[in-house]
């Protein structure tokens, strides 16, 4: 009674509270009224803006009279006109903004709670920034609406202040960033959280799609994996597995041919039985391999079957315990399978389950299970083991019994005879105890023939080691220094040494080329460029389209669109040839769909190379039309080759060398090769054209270049005496004098220079080609001294017959300096990474758009227009064939002074003096006396004492250091006087 009254009292109290709370207080009433007025005002503004008509009278204009078409009446027309004038297109968003503001005000806290002025201040600031930036962006990007600006007066004023300073792009970027800042100030939402939300949403969508794709397979995988988990407790889990298998059969509607044994049928369909089948096949294959190895070993050692079996059962041939355990498990599985074939259906199920567990090779097989299997083995299995004894008597009986036996028994027999490990593991089983009693004669054979077998094995090991050592020293794939090659009968190498490709038909699909031409015209028209294809020149690698531009179209517009054209035409790279010599057209080079390889044999067999008479003729490749392109190194006279790694630079240098080897004998051309990488040019070691060994030490490279400078000066002296201008005239005059019977002697010979009593005759001067494979490495190790030597050779060595081939993979300004570029006008540029590298090599762009693999730009001497060349390819076999051909003709005659550095004064650079002939300063003796007495060897002390300049004092101190009077400067700059002090009188 009391509880019921209490419940009634509580109900009355709650009802009274609900009645009191349903009424609004003063502040809540004000907020709700503001919400109603805000929604009403936004609806009125929407109607006025959507039904605005420019003909209505408004604040911007007066009307001639007539009806007002605005649904908001005259007031609506005035309001819409004012909003459009102030905000432009943004006026359409003001009703929505008004509704949002009133809703936020309606949802604010109660009047007794604290108002955060900082928060509301940032919100108002963000709202103002959003409105201003939105008006500015609308004014820039959208068309005007009626006679109003798209951004209103706010956008016009803002852009009029920003555009003169920031331009269009800068103003747009500034307004966008300001808009983002205003959005953050207004809403308090971080842009990082927006990015994270988008990323998580994308990942969720991807995960949902993947789960959707995998959804069909989940129902099949779950029941398949369940029997494996229950395999440890198999007797209890067997009914549950059978029930699940029956459900799967009903769902998949697979007909059961044997309804009496549904479990066996389902186990055949399980994927888990696939590794079991593979494992059995692997075991049998491995056993067959062991049997084959056993017979092969018996054949090699000339041993009988009995000796082979004794060796298999010997203790020395036993494998490790891990392999023994593994073999035992395989045999247990096989025995289980045999017993299963001769038992009931339930026994078949247990045997198959047991064989599945063997796959795991873990602690699955227990001793109790092994005992069960041993008890289940019946008499036929024992007969199989008993029949193994007669198989060891002779080989014929062994093969006959093996062919007639059943597969399972032969399998066990092979395992017994070839692997003693298996018998050792099964000896603990009840079945395997009888195996040891079957063949008691095996131990006697082992004791009698063990020593003889070990001797045979030791002899075979000794012979095999000797054969391996001989094969290691006589490997045909190694480079042989001294080879006796047959001397060729031809004076120069023949084309048979090079690789000759099969005859290729130059099939040109005219329809495809015309289609590409129309595509080029249409893509150029997309960029508002009117051009017409007037010529198509297909080549082995690229095809050039010649364009006739419309009047007023600049070539620079097409050059700036090269990357866009490559993207539009789905090409790897597009190169624009701005000027074609002799034609008023612009070239557009596109790569072919199928690229052809230009082989060295094709160019050497061409008339251009065959008709060339200069011994320094070099092969470059083929031009865009497929014509062979060769050049004369004597007219270049030096060439600079540059390109990134893998662009074909080293192959191009090898092609130049091989082409000169095809044209010149050692009497005509000699080489000095500098190879810092020790790989590219070392293959030419031993050819008779070399003046010195291939230089791989960079310290010797400067000596070789210095020798070239001395040889250049010597040749100039000889040519001045002969009255000729170049090496060609010198050799011709020598020949004329020899034919006339008046050979010319060395005019600079002096008595004592040699053991001869009369001056020697002048000989023919060969061309000298200096090849540097990696010029950047040489500059890095030796320094600027190499640059001075190369610059001197490049300036004066042309007439003397000395030519340079410089290759580098780092085409930077610190390697290819202005001094080198000014004296080497001929350049070859392979693919480079940037336009800056292309300008460093060629003084113009284009090399960055090449296709690689021998594609190059050739800048001939005396021209500023490059030629697109597809470099010839020479394989390593071609290089070795030509080199071996020249090695068979003779050996090189090296000049030791080239690398040793013993040159005369003519090889010194301007201003450089030899160390032995260096003149001492006239004050040297006085300075020595002063330094020895004062025990101070500073430059400033010498300068003050003798009143000379700093440079002269420093030079004298360096001479003192060279003579060993003072030491080198220490870490503090002081020098120690090494000479002893004079004795005191």
Curated annotation (Swiss-Prot):
Keywords: ATP-binding, Cell cycle, Cell division, Cell inner membrane, Cell membrane, Chromosome partition, DNA-binding, Membrane, Nucleotide-binding, Transmembrane, Transmembrane helix. GO terms for molecular function: ATP binding; DNA binding. It is a multi-pass membrane protein. GO terms for cellular component: plasma membrane. The chain crosses the membrane at residues 35-55, 84-104, 117-137, 145-165, 174-194. GO terms for biological process: cell division; chromosome segregation. It is found in: Cell inner membrane. Belongs to the FtsK/SpoIIIE/SftA family. Essential cell division protein that coordinates cell division and chromosome segregation. The N-terminus is involved in assembly of the cell-division machinery. The C-terminus functions as a DNA motor that moves dsDNA in an ATP-dependent manner towards the dif recombination site, which is located within the replication terminus region. Translocation stops specifically at Xer-dif sites, where FtsK interacts with the Xer recombinase, allowing activation of chromosome unlinking by recombination. FtsK orienting polar sequences (KOPS) guide the direction of DNA translocation. Homohexamer. Forms a ring that surrounds DNA. Consists of an N-terminal domain, which is sufficient for the localization to the septal ring and is required for cell division, followed by a linker domain, and a C-terminal domain, which forms the translocation motor involved in chromosome segregation. The C-terminal domain can be further subdivided into alpha, beta and gamma subdomains. The alpha and beta subdomains multimerise to produce a hexameric ring, contain the nucleotide binding motif and form the DNA pump. This is DNA translocase FtsK. It comes from Vibrio vulnificus (strain CMCP6).
